[in-house]
Amino acid sequence: MSFVLLSKMAKLKFNHIRHTIISTQKSTTIMPGISQLLNNRLIGKEFSSAVPTMFKREDYKLTIHDIAFSKWRNLIRHNDWKDFNNRKERVRRYRHEDLPPQRCTGLYELGVGVIGQDQGQNFDPDNNVLGVYVGQCVDVKSRLQDYGRRGGHLPSGLYEDIFSEGYSVFYRWAPEAAATEGMLLSTFDYAWNTCSNGERRHLELQKLGDPEFMSKRKSQVLVPSIRDQVVTIKVEKSNYTFLTSTLKVMRPFG
């Protein structure tokens, strides 16, 4: 369905809602925010001016974009840097064998997770890795190598904290996905991102060691382009509340 047709349908929906509100105005109390929302839309103001709801990325195992990404792969084990600095035999600072096979432009997510000694091949990244950072670059392989060697541009304290807890660093990537980064950053608050989400929240990643939190992580797929808002109108004479409509509010990508 084209964007033009969707816009026309949305306008008809709002006109119908506004007509309903006007016809019951004498006996109705309307939420000021919703009334202004409707008026703004009808006179051409965009919803994007409103402050969007942000979801903590680590709370969600799945997103609408998962199909575009590779599987989660281990980049740095929690003891790799320590063992390398101690000159332990056959140890490297990062898992170079798990990097993308070619150099290309793309999008990547970093995650943290626990690989227990008893898990071995049964380790399930989807259930045990928390997404903490998203970025894009012209050469994903080189960027990941930089993270593996020296932590990249991220503060060293982030790595020290998670390694001390026994957590490892993971990544997944998708080629040619610059637009997707904007959608993810406009939807999710990543614990290690600051460009759109404010201060880093690395201390909150201690929840990775909380079995109750890990078992309750949300698995539903979030669609960044659509938000649901319920308009409630209270009719005072009848002393009851009814729902007039559920508005599908479209958020622009990026």
Swiss-Prot record:
One Gene Ontology biological process: regulation of DNA-templated transcription
A cellular-component GO term for this protein: cytoplasm
MF terms (GO), sorted A to Z: DNA binding
This protein's record includes keyword Oxidoreductase: no
Major subcellular location class: cytoplasm
UniProt free text on domains: Contains a bacterial GIY-YIG-like domain.
Protein name per the record: Protein EFFECTOR OF TRANSCRIPTION 3
Organism placement in taxonomy: Eukaryota, Viridiplantae, Streptophyta, Embryophyta, Tracheophyta
